[in-house]
Amino acid sequence: MNALMLDLPLVLCLTSVGFYLFCIFSAVCHFSKRKESGKETEFLPPISILKSVCGADAKVYDDLASFCRQDYPLVQLLLGFQDARDPVIPVIRRLMLDFPEMDIRMVLCGRKMGINPKISNLIQVEGQAKHPFLLICDSDIRVGRDYLRRVIWPLRRREVGAVTCMCHALSKGMIGTLEALWESTEFCPHVLAASRLEGIRFGLGSTIVVKREALERIGGLSSIADYLADDYFLGNRIVQAGYRVVLSDVVVEHGLSIRSFGELVLRQIRWNRGIRVCRPWGYRGLLLTYGIPAGLLFLILSGGTLTGWIVFGATASARLAMAYVVGARFLNDRSARSFLWAVPLLDLMSFVLWAFSLVGNTVYWRGRTFKLTREGKLSPILPEGAVSIEVKEPYETASAVTR
């Protein structure tokens, strides 16, 4: 019985070490041979950038301005919001003044077109898009000047329907650092491993560039308007429609606004349950990747023997090596470089939240509680309070204002 109790955590340690090494291998293969960026090519088609925005913080201008400074010939920037008094509006107006040569439009999205407010906005924004290539990304993303040239390049191929990107987070404080560490040292390595094993069959919210014809083939954005993991399902349905989704070697930045540990926990539970619905067997298989908890359990059950310490030390070393190579070296995440020591603590917390999220189907999102269906759709649990939005000139529902 004692041998059996030791065998299970030992097997989990071995599978985890194998997984960590495979993640390192996947990262080296993905980044070491930089893909053709298209910077010297003729493939520079017109592109419309679609963003759903809400509120304004100190970084929002710089985030949006990075899309206006692109080394790219023809770009349209469409920014959708739901409230005619949204504080982001003066920021957009400043953007219009600072970049008069840029086609920037703000769109008041007064209609509710699905449970997911981001997709509801994007559906209405898309109606103003002029170009055959659409770029959808979260509002807190910041990019380099060559971003568009590089992410558009794979779409020159007929079989490619979309391109997506990983990101690293710009964090402040310990709570934000934990979230940033999770993204760069746990989530992104899993993305790289999945890409190497089966190809990318999903999208990432940091960037999804899609051919309009591919989007129309899956029924448009309205087909994912009630889903929590809208980015996942957008990419997945494009694959199901017969296209390929390519993971770019571009890594973008995004800001974090986590304010408390409780908010971090609720966010992680939402992520976990969303992943469990999207990839149920893959989510269960994550048990084989939690080397730190397994190594610690083996150390305790072995009574602190030399063998126990060797197994734990080897497992932890492999985990830290993977975190550094993927997070610090390739994703250039400052949190992974400065707080590498916190990765074991993160893994223990992540394992507890993973186990907790194996059951249950409720998620807390944007101030409301939802039931998550088996299909990944959101179903409100708490009634939504009636909100009256007064629309004033120069705004019209789902209409664009340029300058």
Task: Walk through the language-model features, giving the residues of each.
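Cell-envelope/extracellular polymer assembly enzymes that use nucleotide-activated donors
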Residues: 45-48, 76, 233
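Long helical/loop segments within the catalytic core of UDP-sugar-dependent glycosyltransferases
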Residues: 94-127, 131, 146, 150-222, ...
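Acidic donor-binding loop at a coil-to-helix junction in glycosyltransferase catalytic cores
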Residues: 227-233
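Short, acidic, metal-binding catalytic loop of nucleotide-sugar glycosyltransferases
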Residues: 65-74
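Membrane-embedded multi-pass helical conduit in multi-pass membrane proteins
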Residues: 3-7, 11-18, 25-28, 286-364
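Short beta-strand/loop segment that forms part of the nucleotide-sugar
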Residues: 74-84, 105-110
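Short beta-strand-to-loop acidic/aromatic patch adjacent to the donor-nucleotide binding site
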Residues: 131-142
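N-proximal low-complexity "stem/linker" segments adjacent to membrane-targeting elements
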Residues: 1-65
